[in-house]
Structures are given as C-alpha cells and as structure tokens.
C-alpha cells in the first residue's frame, strides 16, 4: 500500500480529502476516472490544511523557520510565486521526513500561480497552477484553487503509474 500525506494551503485540504475518498471507496467516488488506480493501492496517512507559518513549523517539525512572508495578509502565508515554490518544497520535505510516507504533497499560494510540490520515494516534482491569482486582492483564487487540485491529482496519478507501476 502506497502511503500519502498532504500539507495544503490554497487547496484547503481538498487534494488529500479527494484521494482519501477514492482510496476508501466512497460511493460518490466509484465513477471517478482514477478510481481503479487509487482504490486498493493508496492510503492517506495524513491530510492537513495548514495556512499559517506557525502551524507549518510546529506540525511538520521543519528544523528551521520558513521564509518571512512577502506580503502582509491576516495570519496566513502569503508569498510571491518564486517563494511559494520554495515553501511548497520545504513543506513537502518536512512532511515526508516527519511521516516517512511514500508520497508527500504540499501546496501554497500567495500572489502568482502558487507552488505545488510532490516528493515520491524516487523524485521531486515542483510545479505551479496554470492560473495567476492574488490572495491579497482575492483575484482568481477559486479558479487557481480548482486548477491546483486537478493538476496535482493528475500529476499524482502520473507518478503512481510511472514510479509505482499502477
């Protein structure tokens, strides 16, 4: 069984929840296009929505502080796209190290296309959504979120097929 954990910000834990529902055989997911790949082969060991620096540092035992935010925004992380990519990588690495899972997925997005990182047992994948968004002005954040969820799940399944031969 392939173990998976997520630390999500702009995707609000929906990647982990979706994978969990498919893996667990929820009735509403039995017609999902990836059901036959995920169900019976994958289990979510942790799925987290972590919007704050404080939460990420404490929960993931990162060993070093995350970068200071590029933008002032309530209590949530808000970075440029370049730093979103760095932070997503740090979060995924912390998650993988803390939980010793096969696949760690992390997402974060402030201003830009956001940052998504998937770390498997063999490789690290760092990418963005296809949608420019701005957490501060709330521009395109729902569209960016939906695109990020879909793109990440598609990449996750691609990794399962390529690296785990499913």
Curated annotation (Swiss-Prot):
Question: Membrane-crossing residues?
Answer: none
Tell me the first and last residues of the signal peptide.
none
| Family affiliation | Belongs to the UPF0254 family.
What name appears for this protein in its UniProt entry? UPF0254 protein Maeo_0668
Task: Look up and give the organism this protein is from.
Answer: Methanococcus aeolicus (strain ATCC BAA-1280 / DSM 17508 / OCM 812 / Nankai-3)
């Amino acid at each position: 069984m392939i173990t998976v954990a997520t630390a999500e910000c702009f995707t609000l834990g929906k990647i982990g929840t979706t994978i969990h529902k498919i893996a667990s055989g929820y009735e509403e997911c039995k017609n999902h296009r990836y059901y036959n790949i995920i169900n019976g082969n994958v289990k979510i060991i942790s799925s987290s929505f972590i919007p704050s620096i404080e939460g990420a540092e404490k929960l993931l035992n990162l060993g070093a502080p995350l970068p200071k935010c590029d933008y002032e925004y309530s209590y949530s992380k808000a970075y440029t796209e370049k730093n979103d990519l760095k932070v997503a990588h740090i979060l995924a690495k912390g998650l993988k190290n803390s939980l010793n899972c096969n696949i760690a997925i992390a997402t974060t997005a402030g201003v830009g296309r956001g940052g998504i990182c998937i770390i498997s047992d063999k490789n690290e994948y760092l990418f963005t959504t296809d949608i420019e968004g701005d957490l501060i002005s709330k521009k395109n954040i729902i569209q960016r979120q939906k695109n990020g969820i879909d793109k990440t799940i598609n990449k996750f399944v691609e990794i399962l097929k390529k690296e785990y031969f499913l």
